Amino acid sequence: MAEPRQEFDVMEDHAGTYGLGDRKDQEGYTMLQDQEGDTDAGLKESPLQTPAEDGSEELGSETSDAKSTPTAEDVTAPLVDERAPGEQAAAQPHMEIPEGTTAEEAGIGDTPSLEDEAAGHVTQARMVSKSKDGTGSDDKKAKGADGKTKIATPRGAAPPGQKGQANATRIPAKTPPAPKTPPSSATKQVQRKPPPAEPTSERGEPPKSGDRSGYSSPGSPGTPGSRSRTPSLPTPPAREPKKVAVVRTPPKSPSSAKSRLQTAPVPMPDLKNVKSKIGSTENLKHQPGGGKVQIINKKLDLSNVQSKCGSKDNIKHVPGGGSVQIVYKPVDLSKVTSKCGSLGNIHHKPGGGQVEVKSEKLDFKDRVQSKIGSLDNITHVPGGGNKKIETHKLTFRENAKAKTDHGAEIVYKSPVVSGDTSPRHLSNVSSTGSIDMVDSPQLATLADEVSASLAKQGL
């Protein structure tokens, strides 16, 4: 049941895209025109659907972002469980659409509100991009919010924590709008609307994921979580020729790449039939030939061996040098002549050989004379030899004078004891001092001591 709804949703989104292709530069006018189309279709709701000024819109966006991204089973679950009996009866023909029929053949294209809903998707995405860039005004935000609530009205009243907001945007494209919807469910859907838009809508281009597939929720457009459900419901190839204007493919997410690249498991290789490389198993039992070599010890037969170079032929050969005999004969020297006539003078004696040395005792006293007449003057006495050297003791002390005339008479007492014991007066000493030695016995004794000490020193 999920695949027919996928086809119908893609067809409706392309219809909205073709109808709004010439209104890219008139975003304000497109928004007002879509607003009026929604009002004519009978989808106008009570004033409770407008976003509140006290921040309830931001609160709803935060709660919707916290929810996990629903799977394909969660997308189809609200169609069966959460709707009223009247809505299930109205939605039953859309579940039965075969894959090969178009919307016009099934009778769905006559519904006046389907294209308006697709246009409301585009207007809503553009309004979100305007509010993200900061160029949109408050009244445009209110109009975008009204358009979202009108798109979300066909869904039954569901608790806020039961399904993600992505289901709210996918269900209206598959089921016709119901005029009777409780205001409380529309208010809850308004509170879940977050403001961000895709980065490509800032350049004036319609958002790719919102215009084409309609799977991305207004709470998280362009995020990997909102696009992860796209490859799980592939579009049949019968709807590909309908894409005439621009082929827009949603950006691939890591989860979608993993789901598409699910290859068949590789079978295990048959290890029994594996052939060895380079024929290694063929020679597995090969034994090297060197192991079978036997060393046989045989005695050599040397009887027929011939010597090299004919050495055996001369084995009994005796060298000729062995028979040489050395004969010793005495030499006859009688007939030998001396060289240079030496034999003729064999008895010659040298002339000096007959000289005789005689030793005779010489009488020097009688015959020998002294040279230069030295013997004649043997008794000579030198001329000064008879002179005698007389030694006289000098008595210079008696004649000595004092360098300074102190006026005293120096009495010299000769160390030689003589009979004359009277002191002798120096003749050279002046006696002007008139000091009498007899009168002063101390001076006399002093002079004697001085003279005695000088005499001892040898002066």
From Swiss-Prot:
Keyword Iron-sulfur recorded: no
Biased composition (Low complexity): 212-232
Region annotated Disordered, chain positions: 1-274, 416-435
Residues bearing PTM N-acetylalanine: 2
Compositional bias ranges of the Basic and acidic residues kind: 1-27, 130-149, 200-211
Cross-link (Glycyl lysine isopeptide (Lys-Gly) (interchain with G-Cter in ubiquitin)): 44, 272, 277, 285, 299, 316, 329, 335, 339, 349, 361, 365, 371, 387, 393, 403
Organs and tissues of expression: Expressed in neurons.
Modification Phosphothreonine occurs at: 69, 71, 111, 153, 169, 175, 181, 223, 230, 235, 249, 421, 445
Modified residues (N6-methyllysine): 277
GO CC annotation: axon; cytoplasm; cytosol; dendrite; extracellular region; microtubule; plasma membrane
Disulphides: 309-340
Phosphotyrosine sites (modified residues): 18, 29, 215, 412
Residue windows of the Tau/MAP repeats: 262-292, 293-323, 324-354, 355-386
Known function: Promotes microtubule assembly and stability, and might be involved in the establishment and maintenance of neuronal polarity. The C-terminus binds axonal microtubules while the N-terminus binds neural plasma membrane components, suggesting that tau functions as a linker protein between both. Axonal polarity is predetermined by tau localization (in the neuronal cell) in the domain of the cell body defined by the centrosome. The short isoforms allow plasticity of the cytoskeleton whereas the longer isoforms may preferentially play a role in its stabilization.
Domain comment quoted from the record: The tau/MAP repeat binds to tubulin. Type I isoforms contain 3 repeats while type II isoforms contain 4 repeats.
UniProt protein name: Microtubule-associated protein tau
Organism field: Macaca mulatta (Rhesus macaque)
